[in-house]
A protein has these predicted regions:
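Histidine-dependent nucleotide/RNA phosphoesterase domain, centered on the 2H-phosphoesterase fold
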Residues: 2-179
């Protein structure tokens, strides 16, 4: 895969294995945004082409996941009200997660998400996985067979010619509590 620019991020559709609570600063900080209707439609199309299930209620882009470090002042944890975070779908790839499972993810470019991640870091969050790769997982615990790789390669050709674009909306900032 090509070197990623600082403004390129990965997006994950996996079900978070977290319990999300209102933000108090007691147990780390988690922030995420969700795709708008146009984005959900594009992601559903990608999942169909890959032959994997689509779970719109679990679809999100992680802005920051800080298991240990909370924001220095919980009062600063206000989401950017009404802000839409534009993004561009750029590619599909797979990687091994920290749990050893293989994930298929859709790559996006979103300077606004990168800037919000940096803002929350300046306020005290420490992203638990480096480098920062906010992501929407299209499928988890997948065996990447030659057939699956061929589907990924075909989608990457399509995205190279016509990348999708949409916006993330509805930012949430909450405590992280191991579930």
């Amino acid at each position: 895969m090509k070197n990623l620019s600082p403004n390129r991020i990965q997006v994950s559709l996996s079900k978070p294995e977290l319990v999300l609570n209102p933000y108090t600063g007691a147990s780390g900080v988690y922030s995420a945004v969700v795709p708008d209707v146009s984005g959900l439609n594009q992601l559903e199309f990608l999942c169909k082409k890959l032959g994997v299930g689509f779970h719109p209620d679990e679809t999100h882009c992680t802005v920051v996941y800080s298991k240990e470090a909370a924001l220095t002042d919980p009062a600063t944890a206000e989401p950017v009200a009404g802000k839409a975070f534009w993004y561009c779908l750029t590619h599909i790839e797979h990687w091994k997660g920290h749990d050893g499972k293989t994930y298929i993810v859709a790559g996006v470019c979103s300077p606004a998400v990168v800037m919000e991640h940096a803002r929350l870091r300046r306020l005290g969050a420490k992203h638990s996985f480096t480098p920062f790769k906010a992501h929407i997982t299209l499928s988890s615990d997948v065996e990447v067979t030659p057939e699956v790789q061929a589907k990924i390669d075909e989608l990457n050709l399509e995205l190279a010619l016509a990348p999708g674009s949409a916006s993330f909306i509805n930012q949430k900032i909450v405590d992280v509590k191991k579930g």
